[in-house]
């Protein structure tokens, strides 16, 4: 996917997601384990993404309920494999089991609660943990901003410490680089102010994270922080504050201090700036598509597209076993 030029500010939200979806259509559809798609919204998102050639779904959940939902809302699932599971918790466990059995390259949330799915994903026994901390990224299409914006973490890590933030940042950078958004993203580590002060611990952590990047402990991105939100995304604000930085004013990844601030930032962008947001969980054995009941059809498809492109890149980069 060709990155959006930094100088071309978009005036409508469709173009970035259109290109994202088009890029996902150009690669083979990702085998996707869809957990408990038992309502119209979640099942329609699966059907639409499959019809677009982005995913090849396996539906996991109460088969009778899934078929009744499809029939009631005139959704054609005749070509989909269905793995029966009695309820949402069993569906999550079965979905994780199918990933272990190499039946899917990504996991997708249906109509169950996020906590139910993530309990199965993060379980110490039989889950999908890796050595990397699991984190969430919103891939946001803000109409008035030139670049696609990543915001992390607004859904998984409540009060991340320095080590957790290291993984949160690395997860986001890896997604940006591997899913085709570009190379060496500009990463702004946000706080309330752009100066380091002992009275605001997040400013100290931001400075430490930047030094960790200098020492090669975080790779693949260009970090700066602490930065306040205005001087992270607005060149004039950065200039007025006298901030000289390759990141300030044109950040592509926004790293928030904690889940509360991240959630508020993402929802502010969605409701005030009319942004679309695609949610994906990283750091597990496979990418996990997390959608919300409030997501638009385009945002649901974009979530699948992001995860599909990432899964494709991982497949391409996987080491081959000599015969």
Where in the sequence are the language-model features?
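Anion-binding alpha/beta catalytic cores of soluble intermediary-metabolism enzymes, centered on
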Residues: 1-247, 251-323
């Amino acid at each position: 996917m060709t990155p959006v030029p930094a100088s071309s500010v978009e005036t409508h939200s469709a173009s970035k997601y259109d290109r994202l979806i088009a890029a996902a259509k150009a690669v083979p559809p990702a085998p996707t384990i869809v957990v408990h798609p038992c309502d119209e919204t979640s099942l329609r998102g699966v059907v639409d993404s499959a019809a677009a050639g982005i995913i090849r779904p396996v539906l996991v959940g109460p088969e009778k309920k899934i078929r009744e939902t499809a029939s009631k809302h005139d959704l054609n699932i005749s070509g989909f494999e269905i793995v029966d599971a009695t309820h949402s918790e069993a569906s999550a466990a079965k979905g994780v089991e199918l990933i272990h059995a190499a039946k899917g390259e990504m996991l997708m949330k249906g109509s169950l609660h996020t906590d139910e799915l993530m309990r199965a994903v993060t379980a110490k026994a039989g889950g999908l943990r890796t050595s990397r901390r699991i984190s969430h990224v919103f891939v946001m299409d803000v109409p008035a901003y030139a670049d696609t914006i990543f915001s992390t973490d607004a859904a998984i890590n409540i009060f991340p410490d320095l080590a957790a933030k290291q993984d949160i940042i690395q997860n986001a950078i890896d997604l940006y680089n591997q899913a085709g958004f570009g190379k060496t993203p500009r990463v702004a580590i946000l706080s309330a102010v752009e100066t380091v002060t002992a009275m605001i611990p997040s400013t100290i952590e931001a400075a430490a994270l930047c030094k960790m990047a200098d020492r090669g402990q975080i790779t693949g991105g260009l970090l700066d922080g602490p930065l306040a939100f205005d001087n992270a995304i607005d060149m004039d604000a950065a200039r007025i504050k006298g901030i000289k930085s390759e990141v300030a004013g044109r950040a592509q990844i926004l790293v928030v201090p904690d889940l509360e601030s991240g959630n508020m930032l993402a929802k502010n962008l969605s409701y005030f700036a009319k942004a679309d947001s695609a949610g994906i969980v990283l750091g597990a054995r496979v990418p996990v598509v997390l959608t919300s009941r409030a997501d638009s059809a385009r945002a649901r498809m974009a979530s699948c597209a992001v995860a599909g492109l990432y899964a494709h890149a991982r497949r391409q980069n996987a080491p081959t076993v000599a015969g």
